[in-house]
């Protein structure tokens, strides 16, 4: 026999609240459907629902609550449904790449440039290209900000962001003394270094910054690649070699030793080939 059971109506509100007590403060049970959502009327806890919804990126729930408020639903007149500052949640949603919630918040009038565009900087840092593209299309960025975005993307190895910036003429590969290539080398992002050099970045820019700092930071793959591309080994002077040792990168020291570079044949301004 096929018996249909309505789980929601067959259990009293008190039982559902007891079940909720085992859920460590998570509210997802109430977001299952409209019937369960109405159980929030029975909830007796000190929590702001909108804080929870925004922090989780639940755009559909946020829009549903908006519709209830517009219809003056009694449930949404409870203190737990009071509005909260969406600016701080905007920052977190940009960090986590939640585009639908970001669009929702923009439509709600969020301050896109809050804290010196920290939201967009986080989208770059975490490689959220869709979010960055959307925010960029809103037209709030200056040339100086594009420079900082290029640095952040290169620092964190976000090749997708770099491709976007270059393709859309926001920055050039050689801009700011080959900032993209230098930064990528410094932080060990080999593919981005290759991309930059393939697109005519100057390997010796800024006093051979790329080779010196990739060496001091222990990025052996980057070092070997730069050397293979003709990096000026005179940049590896005695001071640089000592810094490499201080940082504990014995593999770099060993590599340089195999190609004839060591403190024995170096001075403060460059090495002498044996």
From Swiss-Prot:
Transmembrane segments: none annotated. Keywords: ANK repeat, Repeat. This is Putative ankyrin repeat protein L589. The keyword Disulfide bond does not apply. SUPFAM superfamilies: Ankyrin repeat. InterPro entries: Ankyrin_rpt, Ankyrin_rpt-contain_sf. It comes from Acanthamoeba polyphaga mimivirus. The keyword tRNA processing does not apply. ANK repeats lie at residues 85-114, 145-175, 176-205, 206-235.
């Amino acid at each position: 026999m096929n018996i249909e059971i309505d789980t929601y109506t067959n259990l009293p509100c008190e039982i559902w609240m007891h079940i909720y007590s085992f859920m460590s403060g998570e509210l997802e049970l109430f977001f299952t459907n409209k019937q369960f959502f109405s159980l929030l009327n029975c909830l007796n806890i000190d929590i702001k629902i909108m804080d929870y919804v925004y922090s989780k990126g639940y755009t559909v729930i946020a829009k549903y609550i908006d519709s209830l408020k517009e219809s003056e639903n009694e449930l949404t007149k409870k203190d737990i449904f009071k509005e909260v500052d969406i600016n701080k949640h905007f920052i977190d949603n940009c960090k986590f790449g939640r585009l639908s919630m970001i669009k929702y918040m923009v439509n709600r009038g969020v301050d896109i440039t809050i804290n010196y565009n920290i939201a967009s900087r986080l989208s770059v840092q975490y490689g959220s290209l869709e979010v960055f593209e959307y925010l960029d299309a809103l037209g709030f960025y200056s040339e100086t900000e594009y420079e900082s975005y290029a640095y952040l993307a290169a620092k964190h190895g976000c090749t997708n962001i770099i491709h976007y910036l270059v393709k859309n003429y926001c920055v050039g590969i050689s801009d700011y003394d080959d900032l993209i290539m230098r930064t990528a080398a410094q932080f060990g992002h080999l593919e981005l270094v290759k991309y930059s050099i393939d697109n005519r970045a100057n390997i010796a820019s800024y006093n051979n910054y790329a080779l010196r700092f990739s060496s001091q930071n222990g990025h052996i793959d980057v070092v070997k690649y730069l050397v293979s591309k003709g990096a000026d080994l005179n940049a590896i002077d005695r001071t640089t070699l000592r810094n490499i040792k201080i940082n504990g990168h014995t593999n770099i020291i060993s590599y340089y030793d195999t190609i004839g570079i060591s403190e024995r044949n170096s001075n403060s301004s460059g090495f002498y080939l044996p």
